[in-house]
From Swiss-Prot:
Its cofactor is Mg(2+); [4Fe-4S] cluster. The lineage of its organism: Bacteria, Pseudomonadati, Pseudomonadota, Gammaproteobacteria, Pasteurellales. HAMAP family: TtcA. This is tRNA-cytidine(32) 2-sulfurtransferase. GO terms for biological process: tRNA thio-modification. The thiolation reaction likely consists of two steps: a first activation step by ATP to form an adenylated intermediate of the target base of tRNA, and a second nucleophilic substitution step of the sulfur (S) atom supplied by the hydrosulfide attached to the Fe-S cluster. Binds 1 [4Fe-4S] cluster per subunit. The cluster is chelated by three Cys residues, the fourth Fe has a free coordination site that may bind a sulfur atom transferred from the persulfide of IscS. SUPFAM superfamilies: Adenine nucleotide alpha hydrolases-like.
Length: 314
């Protein structure tokens, strides 16, 4: 009797994991297609930190590649920054176990940061710049055409509010960008993925997670406050997070105040410039009492063998 109960439980867990994986595959596949992140013949360098996000990114990309209508290569790269207590064996052992090409880059950025930054000050800014430079260099050495990072939808929304609250900018994380020197293209294939989905997936797949607090730096309190704010909104107002993410995909420049984005000076009597969307000078916009975008992913049953649509390069 107990064996039957365990069997049914295992079946349910397997079914739920299958649904979750297909949802993540669909979201990643859609992001890749919408922003033309990966093209035929690309060599994608997946930056692997040992956290849940980068593990999930690598796993889903490897899974998608099996049925993709284009060919692309994947190489995983980890930057060992020589932080005290960093378990150097975990990532090589894991990457060997899944038979993926990989490179471990050892650079003592930890020592440099500790030398340059006074005790008690945040080290994140300098550490980030050093890490970025090393990863760009490594991509060039490996012949990688794309650099894939594990930032997800929640990261992008948090960054949007951080820039509004503390930077005075309407700016988020782009799903795809080019480096200042024009030599590297960075992509974020998890852009449409929810953090809670990634957390569940990482637990179910039993990824060997490496703690993210080894450097001993102060936590980013501003980001944590914004994260908690968004989580509270998500609990109190279901659908609000999805609507906000939809908003950063539907920008109306003529109804903001950035004269660099929209030329307000060319507005003249008798002429309607392109890009203006509706006259609401005296009218208040009417909104639905509930968010227009509702997340239905939890209710979706995916078709077995579902194909993900990539944009193939001619």
């Amino acid at each position: 009797m107990n064996l039957n109960i365990i069997t049914e439980k295992d079946k349910k867990q397997s079914y739920n994991l299958n649904k979750l994986q297909k949802r993540l595959r669909r979201n990643v596949g859609n992001a890749i297609a919408d922003f033309n992140m990966i093209e035929n013949g690309d060599k994608v360098m997946v930056c692997l930190s040992g956290g849940k996000d980068s593990y999930t990114l690598l796993d889903i990309l490897l899974n998608l590649r099996l049925n993709a209508p284009i060919h692309f290569d994947i190489v995983a790269v980890n930057l060992d920054q020589k932080q005290p207590g960093f378990p150097e064996h975990i990532l090589p052992e894991y990457l060997k176990s899944i038979s993926v090409d990989y490179k471990i880059v050892a650079e003592n950025t930890y020592g440099i940061v500790k030398e340059k930054i006074p005790e008690g000050k945040t080290t994140c800014s300098l550490c980030s710049r050093l890490r970025r430079g090393i990863l760009y260099r490594t991509a060039t050495e490996l012949g990688a055409t794309k650099i894939a990072l594990g930032h997800h939808r929640d990261d992008m929304l948090e960054t949007l509010f951080l820039n509004m609250f503390y930077g005075g900018k309407l700016k988020s994380m782009p799903p795809k960008l080019i480096s200042d020197d024009g030599k590297q293209i960075v992509i974020r294939p998890l852009a449409y993925c929810k953090e809670k989905d990634i957390e569940k997936y990482a637990v179910a797949k039993q990824f060997p997670i490496i703690p993210c607090n080894l450097c001993g730096s102060q936590p980013n309190l501003q980001r944590q406050v914004v994260k908690e704010m968004l989580q509270k909104w998500d609990r109190q107002y279901p659908g609000r997070i999805e609507t906000m993410f939809s908003a950063i995909q539907n920008i109306v420049p003529s109804h903001l105040c950035d004269s660099n984005l929209f030329d307000f000076k060319r507005i003249r009597h008798g002429k309607i410039p392109e890009g203006i969307e509706g006259d609401i000078a005296f009218d208040k916009e009417a909104f639905s009492p509930t968010p227009l975008v509702q997340e239905n992913d939890e209710k979706i049953d995916f078709i077995q063998g579902e194909m993900i649509s990539f944009k193939e390069v001619n």
